[in-house]
Amino acid sequence: MAKIAVYDINRNQVSERELSDEVFNAEVKEYLIHDMVRYQLAARRQGTSAAKNRSAVAGGGKKPYRQKGTGNARQGTIRAPHFVGGGAAFGPSPRDFSFKLNRKVKKAALRSALSARFKEERVAVLNDFQLEKIGTKAVVEVLNRFELSNVLVVVGEDNRNLELSARNLPHVKVLKAEGVNVYDLMNHRNLVVTEGAVEQLEGALG
């Protein structure tokens, strides 16, 4: 099993722990990560864009003029696409962009993403990340001690002070272990995770 140092928020090493190879040192399968990111982004799409076609536009039920004898080209409705005020030809219609991925694929993709960050040496484990009070400055100071920016922070339990302190920081996001996902792991260069969150991740993915 891989080993990693455990620090407190002052960057003092307090212990060392083993990480599950199955979760943090697995083979990195980039195609799974790619599929999972596509899956997450597709599920976010609204898919509400729409345009009225010739049957949806109001009016146009009556033939504008007789078929022959006027010198004009024959027309059946003034709501055809080539008329001003007519319906759109092949315009967008509401659709659902989401698609399905198997649960095994989702878990394997998350293991690959966690392993990728670990192999890049972009994972820091803290024994805890409790703040005495709400304050953005406190979070900045901790991250500066570790010389980290663009960080995903994963905690094992509700940490309201940390969540409120970090939400005003660009490129810093706080998630509970149960909410960790491939997109956020890939969208942040560094991962800071508490020991409690490590145990939860290993329990869920191991």
Swiss-Prot record:
GO terms for molecular function: rRNA binding; structural constituent of ribosome. It comes from the Bacteria. InterPro entries: Ribosomal_uL4 (IPR002136), Ribosomal_uL4-like (IPR013005), Ribosomal_uL4_dom_sf (IPR023574). It holds the Pfam family Ribosomal_L4. Transmembrane segments: none annotated. The keyword Ribosomal protein applies. Keywords: Ribonucleoprotein, Ribosomal protein, RNA-binding, rRNA-binding. Residues 50-78 are annotated as: Disordered. GO terms for biological process: translation. One of its GO terms (cellular component) is ribonucleoprotein complex. The keyword Lipid metabolism does not apply. Part of the 50S ribosomal subunit. Belongs to the universal ribosomal protein uL4 family. PANTHER family: 50S RIBOSOMAL PROTEIN L4, LARGE RIBOSOMAL SUBUNIT PROTEIN UL4M. One of the primary rRNA binding proteins, this protein initially binds near the 5'-end of the 23S rRNA. It is important during the early stages of 50S assembly. It makes multiple contacts with different domains of the 23S rRNA in the assembled 50S subunit and ribosome. This is Large ribosomal subunit protein uL4. It comes from Syntrophotalea carbinolica (strain DSM 2380 / NBRC 103641 / GraBd1). The lineage of its organism: Bacteria, Pseudomonadati, Thermodesulfobacteriota, Desulfuromonadia, Desulfuromonadales. The gene is rplD.
